Swiss-Prot record:
GO terms for cellular component: TAT protein transport complex. GO terms for molecular function: protein transmembrane transporter activity. It is found in: Cell inner membrane. The chain crosses the membrane at residues 1-21. Gene3D superfamilies: 1.20.5.3310. Its main location: membrane. InterPro entries: TatA/B/E, TatA/E. Part of the twin-arginine translocation (Tat) system that transports large folded proteins containing a characteristic twin-arginine motif in their signal peptide across membranes. TatA could form the protein-conducting channel of the Tat system. GO terms for biological process: protein transport by the Tat complex. Residues 72-92 have a biased composition (Basic and acidic residues). The gene is tatA. This is Sec-independent protein translocase protein TatA. It comes from the Bacteria.
């Protein structure tokens, strides 16, 4: 038999109907049905063959970046730092 007998399922069904009401259960059933229908449609769309992919035309000559010399000298920037004012509250 198992844990739940048919009598247990009837009691559970009655409690669910009393808690949620028939209108909410009907709406829930409709929403679940529409979700399943959308899922099946998406699965069928995936099974259809896709449009043929157009291969892009390769460039005439491959682009090779020119080699550059590494930077050997040190560079510094002369800047002057400015002090930032502390923020003040305007509502006090």
């Amino acid at each position: 038999m198992g844990i739940f007998d048919w009598k247990h399922w009837i009691v559970i069904l009655v409690v669910v109907v009393l808690v949620f009401g028939t209108k909410k259960l009907k709406n829930l059933g409709t929403d679940v049905g529409e979700s399943i229908k959308g899922f099946r449609k998406a699965m069928n769309d995936d099974e259809k063959p896709a449009d043929p992919v157009v291969n892009p035309v390769p460039p005439a000559q491959p682009v090779h970046p020119q080699a550059t010399q590494p930077i050997t000298e040190r560079r510094t920037f002369d800047v002057q730092a400015e002090k930032v004012e502390e923020p003040t509250r305007k509502d006090s």
